[in-house]
Structures are given as structure tokens and as C-alpha cells.
Amino acid sequence: MKDIPVFTTDDGVASLALQQIPHTGFAHITVHSASAFSDFLQECVGFCRTVGAERIFACGHKDLEQYPIYARVLSMQMPIPEDVEQACLFPVTVESLDKWLDIYNTGMKDVPNAVALSKQAGKELVEKGTAYFVHENGNVLGIGVVEDDTVRAIVSCQKGAGELVMNSLFGALCGDIVKVEVAENNGPAINLYQRMGFVTTGILKTWYDVTKIF
């Protein structure tokens, strides 16, 4: 299943994130413009259902506020601490990508607003050098995605290792501030970030549940 970056009809333009349908049954619609919003939303939702989506969420238009909120995506940040315990970082390679993707997609399966990654998406991360394993004493503690000053994703493979995995990913960051993006209803992640000292700086995006619009 492939995403559709530009989905167009006579009524509007949107991006459809469909890659997670085989994993979670979820589809995400980002509306870019709409001349007839209600009609266009129905067209988008109808298409997502046709390709197998069981839950459908949308963002990007003020008229979506009439629908139930599924998730607000928060921006959080903190100064990068000094002298914290860190494990070893290993960049993901083409040879280790399958293992990394398996950990990522398994760990993200039940995370609110998370998107499953395809093999092609994984290859793009490898090319950019932004995907990592976190190891300690030969054991995989977790994985992550780091871009510039932002930790884009983190998965802990061992109970209680989340803080160590995050601290280790700090080593791949640029600058003195670390940022994360997290769904407001992702309780475990919010609790981890707050315990570490992250503070909320804003709402980046609000997803609305449009599964039952017609």
C-alpha cells in the first residue's frame, strides 16, 4: 500500500497516508485546499474505505472542528542535559534495515497517530543517516530517528529502557535543544518526556476522526 502525496478531485487537494492500513487499518487525510469541503472530505473518506481503511483521520481545514478530536500533536522541548548515561549508537545500514523496520513497526503499531514505515521509507532514512540502533553490551535497547534538533521517533525494546534510549539519541542531535513531537493521547511517551524535563511549547496539528461522516 502506497501513500498518495497529491490526491485531487474537482473539489480539492489532499495527501492520503495509506501505508499503515495493512498494519493498523488507519488512514490519514491532510487537506491542502477545498472549494467544496464537505463533498471533498466525503470523496477522500470514500477512497480510503475502498482501499481497506477501518479508521480514518483528517487534519488541515477549519471545518474539521465539527468532528471528534482523535489526537493533538504536541511540540515539546528541553535543553540537552550534560553528563547523562548513554549507550552506544549504531547507524542503520541496508543490511540491518529489515531488523530495524520490524522493531519500529511492531513498537509503533498501537501508538496513537504513528505511521507504519515501508521498506522504501526505511531506505530513505538509511540514505539520510537519521535512523539508529541503541546498543548496550551487545543488546539492542531500542531504536530511534533523529533529524537535526528533533527526535522524530523512539522505540524501547526493553522495559524501563526508554530514558536511556532517549539520552543515547541525544548524541546524534545538532544544537543545545532537543525537540520531540508526540500525540497528546500517547500517555507513556508524555510521561517519559515530562519525567525527563521536556515542556510543551505548542500544538503542531490536530487530527479529527472522520470515520463515520456518512
Predicted regions and their residues:
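Acyl-donor-binding surface of acyltransferase catalytic domains
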Residues: V31-A87, V180, L204-Y208
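Conserved acetyl-CoA-binding loop-helix of GNAT-fold acetyltransferases
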Residues: A34-F47, Q158-L173, I190-R195
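Active-site rim helix/loop that mediates acceptor-substrate recognition in acyltransferases
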Residues: M1-T8, D110-N137
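Short amphipathic alpha-helix that is part of the acyltransferase structural core
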Residues: M1-V6, V84-A114
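Conserved donor-binding loop and adjoining core beta-sheet/short helix segment
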Residues: M1-E43, E136-Q158
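Short acidic/polar active-site loop segments enriched in Thr and Asp
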Residues: E54, D176-V178, V199
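Conserved active-site loop/cleft motifs that coordinate metal ions or position small ligands
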Residues: R152-A153, V178-E181
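Conserved active-site alpha-helix within GNAT-family acetyltransferase domains
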Residues: H61-R72, E163, N185-I203
